Structures are given as structure tokens and as C-alpha cells.
């Protein structure tokens, strides 16, 4: 049997790093748009004895015995996901968003088929056809981008490319785009060329669940998402679809056995918890505040002379262009990190710098809103960001801002204990 010994006693080296990360999360302001803080209930499910159980297959059709309780858990997660997003089909087994996306490709395409997706350089995701990713290596990837005048998706270009290249599938969705996506326009374009429409709503799933952002679920053929980010659950994936028996069968077999073996039952349980949390009345107020906070920060930074791609935001994030300031994203990331403000460097459209340097940073408000920040706090925060950037990383300015950050973090703890 196991020795009755704690992690800190058994592996102090590892425990020390975990404790340091705990302290970092409490003392730093998190503005990475893809990060959030999940609830103790989600973490309790994720850390449960379910991690011991193997359960290849689906509820009622397993390849292992002893699955009577995990069947109940997985079915609960499926039913909640369908109810939350108004879907006819849900697969809760994907380990992550990228695995969910790869299963969709496997289900709907053959190697070499043409895919039309958003360019990574313009706000798309690796799995939307980037050359370094399976989606750009296995398939013939054509990329669309933003209108250089507006900083918004150029739907006319999407339609032109679709007519020219006749893709088998069009991918809509993003990892760094701050406006409302016109899902129906994508649907119309897909129908015009006889393509599947696949939406990756990983970044806005929480907003969609709360009715704060338009839902693509009954418009697209297939929709995927992560379950963290705005959804505020465990780091995992989810596939949703409207009713189509043929596509549902293809998706089921693409996930298992096509793309994965045994599901992570502890993660599925944590997803079930986060879906239930997203059905609570206060969840909509949270998501509304996420958007208000992003808009408030954008307003302050614009007033301080900074450029935001597309001129503002309708969701939880925005891209701050630093080209005018002659500051790199890498520099801004480091300076703000020294002030206990965590962001990520990010390319801006037509960025002259490399992806390892970039000319911008991406800012998102899901985590600070979970923490309890309102518009007053994020306006102060945006001013502090401008102070650090204006100073070009001056040590005294960074020290002053860091002290303010530590004070506000103490006032708004992530986890009370």
C-alpha cells in the first residue's frame, strides 16, 4: 500500500515548484486571454480517484469492465454540454482543443483535401492550416486574413478564396480576434462552394454559453472548443454538432479509436462540473463583465495613444499593436512580467517582426474578472500597463507598478485559502 505521506514530504523538489506557482497566481495579474481560474469543485473532480480508471469506448459500449459509474459521469457531461450549448451531439472525450480539431479533420476530410482557414499571422490558430501543424501538412491549406483597413475579417476575401480553391472544409474561429464573427456569412460561403463549415469557438465558448456572443452551434456542421479559457473549466476539449447522423458517426469513430485511446475520466468529470457552473444565473453576469472589462481596458489604452487592432473589442480580448511605439512584443511581455502583470507577446497583422519577437501583445480579461476585478480596477490596470510601456521598461516605474499590483492582488485573492 501507499505510505501515508504528503507530496511535500515525498517530493519536496516538486512540491516547492507547485507552491511557488500557487504564490505566483495569487501575486500576479493574469491577462493571458486563454487562461482562467477554475473552481475548487472542478479541481476536486479532476484530482479524484477517477484518474485510476480506464474506459476505452463510449457509455454502454466499453472495452473494459467496471465502467458502470464512469458511464454515468460521461453521460452527465454529454447531456449538460448539449443543454448548455443547444447542441444535438456532444463528444466530451477529446483531451484538448487541438485533439478535438484533429478529430474533425479526420472525420470529414481525406489527406490532401483543401481547407480554408484563418491565417495564424492574422489571428487564427495552429490547427486552422498553419504550415508547421498537421492541418497544414496533411491537407492543402489556404489561408484568409483581415481587411488591412478595418482590422476585421475580410469576408469578401473569404468568399473569393472559397470560389477559387473550392475547399472541402472552411474553418471559422480564432485565437486572437476581438470582434463578433458573422457565422451565418461563413455558412453562406460554405454552402455556395459545397464545403463543410467547422467552427472553433475555443476562445468564446464561455461567452456563447452565457448568450453574450452569437452561437455557431446550429449554424456550423461541427463546432469545437476547449473547456478552459472563458468557459472556466479544466484544460480539455469538446466537440459539438447539430443533428446529422452521418457526421455524428464519423465524429465518434474519429475521436475513438481514430485519434485517441482511453478517455481521461477525471477530466470528463471536471467538464461536467464546469458545464453545470455555466448554467448558473450568475455565470451570465460574469461573462458580461468579462466583455465590459476588456472594453474598458481598450478605451484607456487608446486614450493613452496605443493602437488596438480593429480599434476595439466585442469580446474578452484585444491585440495591442506596439509598432507606433517602436516596442517589441517580447520587450513588453518582459517588462510587464517584471511588474507582475502577465501577458503574451503576439504578432499583429502584417507584422514585420518574427513570431519570437512580434510587434504586439494580446490582452484578455477572463482571469481578472474571475478574480473580482470590475471596470474601475481594470482601468487602473490599463493605465499601469501604459506607464510601463511609456517608460520603455524603466526600473523605477516597474517597481512602482509592481507595488500597486501586489496591493490589488491582496485585495482580490484568487482562492480565499
From Swiss-Prot:
GO terms for cellular component: cytosol. It comes from the Bacteria. Its EC number is 2.1.2.1. Its cofactor is pyridoxal 5'-phosphate. The keyword Transferase applies. It is found in: Cytoplasm. The keyword Nucleus does not apply. Coiled coil: none annotated. Pfam families: SHMT. It catalyses: (6R)-5,10-methylene-5,6,7,8-tetrahydrofolate + glycine + H2O = (6S)-5,6,7,8-tetrahydrofolate + L-serine. Pathway: One-carbon metabolism; tetrahydrofolate interconversion; Amino-acid biosynthesis; glycine biosynthesis; glycine from L-serine: step 1/1. Homodimer. HAMAP family: SHMT. This is Serine hydroxymethyltransferase. It comes from Acinetobacter baylyi (strain ATCC 33305 / BD413 / ADP1).
Amino acid at each position: 500500500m501507499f505510505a501515508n505521506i504528503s507530496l511535500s514530504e515525498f517530493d519536496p523538489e516538486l512540491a516547492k515548484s507547485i507552491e511557488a506557482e500557487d504564490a505566483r497566481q495569487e501575486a500576479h495579474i493574469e491577462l493571458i486571454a486563454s487562461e482562467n481560474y477554475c473552481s475548487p469543485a472542478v479541481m476536486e473532480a479532476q484530482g479524484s480517484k477517477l484518474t485510476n480508471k480506464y474506459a476505452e469506448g463510449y457509455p454502454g459500449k466499453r472495452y473494459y469492465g467496471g465502467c458502470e459509474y464512469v458511464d454515468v459521469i460521461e453521460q452527465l457531461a454529454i447531456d449538460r454540454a448539449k443543454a448548455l450549448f443547444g447542441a444535438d451531439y456532444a463528444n466530451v472525450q477529446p483531451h484538448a482543443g487541438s485533439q478535438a480539431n484533429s478529430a474533425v479533420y479526420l472525420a470529414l476530410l481525406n489527406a490532401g483535401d483543401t481547407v480554408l482557414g484563418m491565417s495564424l499571422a492574422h489571428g487564427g490558430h495552429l490547427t486552422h492550416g498553419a504550415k508547421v501543424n498537421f492541418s497544414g501538412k496533411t491537407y492543402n491549406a489556404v489561408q484568409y486574413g483581415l481587411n488591412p483597413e478595418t482590422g476585421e475579417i475580410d469576408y469578401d476575401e473569404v468568399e473569393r478564396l472559397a470560389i477559387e480553391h473550392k475547399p472541402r472544409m472552411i474553418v471559422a474561429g480564432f485565437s486572437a480576434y476581438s470582434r463578433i464573427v458573422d457565422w451565418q456569412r461563413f455558412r453562406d460561403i460554405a454552402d455556395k462552394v459545397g464545403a463543410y463549415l467547422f467552427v472553433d469557438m475555443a476562445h468564446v465558448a464561455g461567452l456563447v454559453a452565457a448568450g453574450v456572443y452569437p452561437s455557431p452551434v446550429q449554424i456550423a456542421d461541427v463546432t469545437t472548443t476547449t473547456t478552459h479559457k472563458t468557459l472556466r473549466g479544466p484544460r480539455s476539449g469538446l466537440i459539438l454538432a447539430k443533428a446529422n447522423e452521418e457526421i455524428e458517426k464519423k465524429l465518434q469513430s474519429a475521436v475513438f479509436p481514430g485519434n485517441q485511446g482511453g478517455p481521461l475520466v477525471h477530466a470528463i468529470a471536471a467538464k461536467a462540473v464546469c458545464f453545470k457552473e455555466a448554467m448558473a444565473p450568475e455565470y451570465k453576469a460574469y461573462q458580461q463583465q468579462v466583455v465590459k472589462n476588456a472594453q474598458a481596458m481598450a478605451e484607456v489604452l487608446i486614450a493613452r495613444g496605443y493602437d488596438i487592432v480593429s480599434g476595439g473589442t466585442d469580446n474578452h480580448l484585444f491585440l495591442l499593436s506596439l509598432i507606433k511605439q517602436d516596442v517589441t512584443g517580447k520587450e513588453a511581455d518582459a517588462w510587464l512580467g517584471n511588474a507582475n502583470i502577465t501577458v503574451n507577446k503576439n504578432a499583429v497583422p502584417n507584422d514585420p517582426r518574427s513570431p519570437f519577437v512580434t510587434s504586439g501583445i494580446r490582452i484578455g480579461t477572463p482571469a481578472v474578472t474571475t478574480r473580482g476585478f470590475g471596470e474601475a480596477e481594470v482601468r487602473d490596470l490599463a493605465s499601469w500597463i501604459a506607464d510601463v510601456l511609456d517608460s520603455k521598461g524603466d526600473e523605477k516605474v516597474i517597481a512602482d507598478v509592481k507595488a500597486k499590483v501586489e496591493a490589488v492582488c491582496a485585495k482580490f485573492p484568487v482562492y480565499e485559502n
